Amino acid sequence: TKYQLQTAPGVALMKNDPASIQDAGNQGFIQDASFATTDDGGTGGASYDNTGHAKLVGVLNGFFFIDNTTKKPTFANNVAASQAFGTNPNTGSTNGFAFVNNDPFQEYICKADAAISQANQNALAYNCNNNDGSNKDGQSVVTLEIGSNNADTSMFTVIGTAEDPENEDITAAGCNVKVVMAAAARLYG
């Protein structure tokens, strides 16, 4: 689904990061929820708490904007903080679009930063680690923050291993796990 993306966002946006809609400041625009402080001044990343901050709408899946230098339509995996867009000749707007996977039951693969106990699968919700602006080819490199979990206020629920033979041991840091947006953290569904 397309969401409005403000020109010159306060923090970067990266493909595969959790997303929410700004509920203060420039209300209604999409924002990356993996940074410690989000565009609307809320708390994201490892300290995210859905009781006082914008709920998740999904996971970022790419961006479209008019490049401010070349004036060409651009599809990208990320948008840098403070990146200004050019004026769209079709709409007259300097805003762009973010494409978001917003199915509340969509499963995602995420790398855990620590071991996960079998008892905590399907029981607790976890946040992602704070995004510090690092990326791999424009895509997110954040991991699931296993040290902070709360079934009522965190972002994602682990539903199983990713069945990746080289990375499916949940007793080891770096295992790949399947997650869904935690029911209490999502705006839709």
Per-segment meaning from a language model:
Residues 1-189:
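Surface-exposed, low-hydrophobicity beta-strand/loop segments enriched in small/polar/acidic residues
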